[in-house]
UniProtKB/Swiss-Prot annotation:
GO terms for biological process: translation. It comes from Chlamydia trachomatis serovar L2 (strain ATCC VR-902B / DSM 19102 / 434/Bu). The keyword rRNA-binding applies. GO terms for cellular component: cytosolic small ribosomal subunit. Keywords: Ribonucleoprotein, Ribosomal protein, RNA-binding, rRNA-binding. Belongs to the universal ribosomal protein uS3 family. Residues 39-107 form the KH type-2 domain. One of its GO terms (molecular function) is rRNA binding. Pfam families: KH_2 (PF07650), Ribosomal_S3_C (PF00189). It comes from the Bacteria. The keyword RNA-binding applies. Binds the lower part of the 30S subunit head. Binds mRNA in the 70S ribosome, positioning it for translation. This is Small ribosomal subunit protein uS3.
C-alpha cells in the first residue's frame, strides 16, 4: 500500500516525527485536533509564512508552542521582530491561549518537498510551461544531493479541455521501503483554466527509526 497512502503518514513514528506533540484525553483530543488544524490553516494564509515548509504544534500546561520551518526566517520574523509579535497576538486571539512562536530555518530548501511543490505552483501561476517547471525542479533536487525525485501535475494542463496527469521521475523513490526517508508534499496552482494539483516525492536516503521516546503517546495530525 506504499503507492496509495501518504508517504509521510505511512512513516510517522517510524522514521518521521509527529507534527503535533501533545497528550489529550477523550474529552480534549477532538478539541485539540481541530485547534491544530485552525492554527495551520491560519498560518498558511499569512503572507509572512508563504515560504514555510511546515508547522509543528506543541502543548504544555495551557500554553501552545508553534515552530515554523521556513527557508526565509527574516520574512517571518519581520523588522525588529514585529511580524512574530503580530503572529503571537493573532494566534492568541484565535485559540484563547498563550502562544509562543519559534522559527526554524530550512537549510536546504531544494530538498524540502513542500518548498519544491510551492515553487512549481508559483511558476505555473506565472504561466511558465508546466513541463519546464517540473524538469527544472527535478534537476535542482538531484543537484542538491537527493537519491531520487518524482513530480506529478494534474488538471487542465496547458488549458486542455480534458484534465490529465503527467509526471517525471529521476533516480529511485522506493515508497514501500519504510526505512527510506521519503519527503512528500502537495500544492495547488490557480490558473485561468482551473486548479492544477502538484505532488512531489523526494528520496533523501535511508534513515534510522525514530526513538520511541520521541513519539510514544503523542497525538498527531498529518496535515502540514
Amino acid at each position: 500500500m506504499g503507492q496509495k497512502g501518504c508517504p509521510v503518514g505511512f512513516r510517522t513514528a517510524v522514521t518521521k516525527k509527529w507534527r503535533s506533540l501533545w497528550y489529550g484525553n477523550n474529552q480534549e483530543f477532538g478539541k485539540f485536533l481541530i485547534e491544530d488544524v485552525k492554527i495551520r490553516e491560519f498560518l498558511k494564509k499569512k503572507p509572512s509564512c508563504q515560504g514555510a515548509a511546515g508547522f509543528v504544534v506543541k502543548r504544555m500546561s495551557g500554553k501552545i508552542e508553534v515552530t515554523i520551518h521556513t527557508a526565509r526566517p527574516g520574512l517571518v520574523i519581520g523588522k525588529k521582530g514585529a511580524e512574530v509579535e503580530s503572529l503571537k497576538a493573532e494566534l492568541k486571539k484565535l485559540t484563547g491561549k498563550d502562544v509562543w512562536v519559534e522559527i526554524a530555518e530550512v537549510k536546504r530548501p531544494e530538498l524540502n518537498a513542500q518548498l519544491v511543490a510551492d515553487g512549481i505552483a508559483k511558476q505555473i501561476e506565472r504561466r511558465v510551461s508546466f513541463r519546464r517547471a517540473m524538469k527544472k525542479a527535478l534537476q535542482s533536487v538531484m543537484d542538491a544531493g537527493a537519491l531520487g525525485v518524482k513530480v506529478q501535475v494534474s488538471g487542465r494542463l496547458a488549458g486542455a479541455e480534458i484534465a490529465r496527469s503527467e509526471w517525471y521521475k529521476n533516480g529511485r523513490v522506493p515508497l514501500h521501503t519504510l526505512r527510506a526517508d521519503i519527503d512528500y508534499a502537495t500544492a495547488s496552482a490557480e490558473t485561468t483554466y482551473g486548479i492544477i494539483g502538484i505532488k512531489v516525492w523526494i528520496n533523501l536516503g535511508e534513515k534510522k527509526a525514530v526513538p520511541a521516546a520521541n513519539h510514544a503517546g503523542a497525538a498527531s495530525t498529518a496535515a502540514a
